[in-house]
């Protein structure tokens, strides 16, 4: 989202605070601190940020650094709807948010969240976009033209008469963006807007955001983990021109031009587990600037691949522990068997002990439906699933929470779990300081860590995980992959879905690809990732790093070693 507007503050936080507040700023946070009940440490500490109309800001920070809390504070959800102690002041358009209702604030600030389905209220797109205007009393004669303008801005005019229930992930997110911007908010908050999308949907949403911002010119605050996918081929230039970095204590570490912030803080951000543009990560690890096109960077990556060693995991997997045979999964809810168009048909697969299998496919190809069927939570209309009873990690972590505290969630169903074992699990997943918190009060990344920790605590021979690294920062992604790897090394079978092909290349032994309502490929991970025809049919797009490594190395062991060395540059969880 390029912009010619200069950043309104410098790298020096103290200088930013000392500067007078211009009357033209649309958003002003001054010395803001947020504390939640039963959580002694502040989630945000003395945060001061000013945002001018049309200015664009990206927020970097590890999981738990307060990014979600910052967005909730800007919208007024904190403290109006979420119980929290708010210090300092938040002004939106010159008005103190503490003195303004969330309803009034919603006229000034719009939010596009991770899951487009969570914000959809009405059955068709036209009604969905008309609703915000009707709520504001807009002349009905003007609404149709406003709908066309909003859909044009997100490049989705063809969706106007579609059912919202039939939209793909990318289409749904573009409609959510249009429904947010149609009311012309002064501030647009983008909370990981591409995190649940496949490559095709992500590209469409990326283009839609840029087009919509150019049309409506709101101030923008972006939180995004999938930095490289979000920017596409533009790299750092595709990010908002101003960056704010939050430390683990919720303090402002840096605030200034994105290029300068990444140049000065890239190494520490990488060590602290933030997802970064690839060129910044490679500079931090190899010491060479310029990205994959520079000889020094390529030489640095080659050196990381030496010596090749072993792949790190044994290849002689154990016995078959779960089998699906000729499975058909129907789509229609309440439709008689055989009358609904199937989500998947003719699916047969085996899972072996000690093997890690990645399940790939675009949005809507049936990955979640297949996992739920294998878990025994959905019954196939045709075919059979036999074998061990699996454990399931849901994409939405809250769907598996049943207790009131983090420690209770891990203990659930494990009466013999000792206190020492519980403490070890809490420590391994960086949850010790949250042991007495409600699972529902955690950040998105913390909820994901808890869902993984709770299911790994059960000794199920088969573990199914729906996007297990969704919403995690780099450090917690690495820790989660390590935990899944250890479970496989102990003989458990792992099947996980993912949109992240770097994660797949790092962890998986085998890949199953879904497209056109069936399995189109099933084979060793690097063999499948080299099948261009399969990737194209499935709508999958290799990240630039993985594409480069597949061309650079004939040895799969060296590819995995490079990926491991890049992960090793990230600091271990504390």
Please name every model-derived segment:
Residues 75, 375:
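Helix-to-loop junction immediately C-terminal to a conserved catalytic motif
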Residues 223-225, 498-499:
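H-loop/switch region of ABC-family ATPase nucleotide-binding domains
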Residues 188-191, 463-466:
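Catalytic Walker B motif of ABC-type/P-loop ATPase nucleotide-binding domains
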Residues 266-323, 535-574:
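ABC ATPase nucleotide-binding domains
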Residues 180-181, 455-456:
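ABC ATPase C-loop
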Residues 249-274, 518-542:
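Conserved beta-strand-loop-alpha-helix hinge in the C-terminal portion
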Residues 141-159, 419-434:
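Conserved ABC ATPase "signature" region
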Residues 184, 459:
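Conserved catalytic motifs of ABC-family nucleotide-binding domains
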């Amino acid at each position: 989202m390029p912009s010619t507007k200069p950043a309104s503050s410098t790298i020096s936080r103290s200088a930013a605070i000392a500067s007078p507040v211009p009357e033209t700023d649309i958003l002003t946070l001054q010395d803001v601190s947020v504390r939640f009940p039963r959580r002694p440490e502040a989630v945000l500490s003395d945060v001061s940020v000013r945002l001018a109309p049309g200015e664009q800001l990206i927020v970097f920070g590890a999981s738990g650094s307060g990014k979600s809390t910052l967005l909730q504070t800007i919208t007024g959800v904190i403290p109006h709807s979420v119980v929290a102690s708010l210090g300092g002041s938040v002004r939106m358009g010159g008005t103190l948010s503490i003195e303004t209702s969330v309803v009034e604030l919603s006229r000034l600030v719009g939010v596009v969240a991770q899951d487009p389905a969570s914000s959809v209220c009405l059955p068709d797109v036209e009604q969905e976009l008309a609703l915000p205007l009707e709520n504001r009393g807009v002349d009905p004669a003007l609404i149709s033209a406003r709908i066309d303008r909003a859909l044009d801005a997100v490049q989705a005019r063809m969706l106007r008469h579609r059912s919202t229930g039939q939209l793909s992930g990318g289409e749904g997110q573009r409609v959510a963006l249009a429904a947010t911007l149609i009311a012309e908010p002064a501030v647009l908050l983008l909370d990981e807007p591409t995190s649940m999308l496949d490559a095709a949907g992500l590209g469409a949403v990326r283009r839609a955001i840029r087009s919509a911002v150019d049309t409506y010119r709101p101030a923008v605050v972006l939180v995004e983990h999938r930095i490289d996918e979000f920017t596409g081929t533009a790299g750092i230039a595709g990010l908002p021109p101003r960056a704010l970095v939050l430390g683990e204590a919720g303090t402002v570490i840096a605030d200034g031009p994105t290029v300068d912030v990444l140049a000065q803080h890239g190494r520490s951000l990488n060590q602290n587990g933030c997802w970064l543009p690839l060129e910044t990560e490679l500079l931090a690890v190899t010491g060479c600037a310029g990205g994959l096109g520079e000889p020094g960077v390529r030489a640095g990556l080659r050196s990381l691949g030496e010596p090749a060693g072993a792949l790190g995991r044994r290849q002689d997997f154990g016995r078959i522990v779960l089998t699906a045979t000729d499975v058909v999964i129907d789509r229609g809810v309440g439709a008689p068997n055989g009358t609904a168009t199937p989500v998947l048909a003719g699916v047969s697969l085996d899972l072996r002990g000690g093997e890690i299998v990645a399940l790939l496919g675009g949005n809507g190809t049936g990955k979640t439906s297949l996992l739920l069927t294998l878990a025994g939570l959905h019954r196939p209309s045709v075919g059979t699933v036999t074998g061990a009873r699996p454990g399931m990690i849901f994409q939405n972590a809250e769907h598996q929470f049943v207790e009131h505290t983090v420690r209770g969630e891990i203990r659930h169903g494990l009466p013999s779990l000792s206190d020492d074992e519980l403490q070890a699990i809490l420590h391994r997943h960086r949850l010790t300081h949250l042991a007495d918190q409600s699972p529902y009060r955690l950040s998105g990344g913390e909820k994901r860590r808890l869902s993984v920790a709770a299911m790994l605590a059960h000794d199920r021979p088969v573990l199914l995980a729906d996007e297990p690294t969704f919403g995690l920062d780099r450090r917690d992604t690495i820790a989660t992959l390590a935990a899944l790897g250890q479970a496989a090394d102990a003989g458990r079978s792992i099947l996980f879905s993912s949109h992240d092909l770097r994660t797949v290349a790092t962890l998986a032994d085998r890949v199953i690809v879904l497209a056109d309502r069936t399995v189109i490929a099933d084979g060793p991970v690097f063999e499948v990732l080299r099948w261009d025809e399969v990737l194209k049919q499935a709508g999958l797009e290799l990240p630039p790093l993985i594409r480069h490594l597949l061309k650079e190395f004939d040895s799969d062991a060296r590819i995995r070693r490079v990926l491991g060395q890049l992960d090793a540059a990230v600091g271990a969880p504390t």
